């Protein structure tokens, strides 16, 4: 079982694609600075820590207003 669960994460961020993108960007930041906002993370990997931050509502995103032309 994954912790945090995908269901609880999708309540915070509505799209799986956006969830992965936000978590990957935050994981990259943590690799460079080694700063995690979660007090005692369960995961030892950066992506897992980023997902825990999203689940704890310590990390969120603001959607872009820019629309991609088709």
Curated annotation (Swiss-Prot):
Enzyme class, broadest EC rank: transferase
A single BP term in Gene Ontology: DNA-templated transcription
GO annotation, cellular component aspect: DNA-directed RNA polymerase complex
One Gene Ontology molecular-function label: DNA binding
EC number, UniProt record: 2.7.7.6
The protein's assembly and partners: The RNAP catalytic core consists of 2 alpha, 1 beta, 1 beta' and 1 omega subunit. When a sigma factor is associated with the core the holoenzyme is formed, which can initiate transcription.
Family recorded in the similarity comment: Belongs to the RNA polymerase subunit omega family.
Function: Promotes RNA polymerase assembly. Latches the N- and C-terminal regions of the beta' subunit thereby facilitating its interaction with the beta and alpha subunits.
Identification of the protein by name: DNA-directed RNA polymerase subunit omega
Lineage: Bacteria, Bacillati, Bacillota, Bacilli, Bacillales
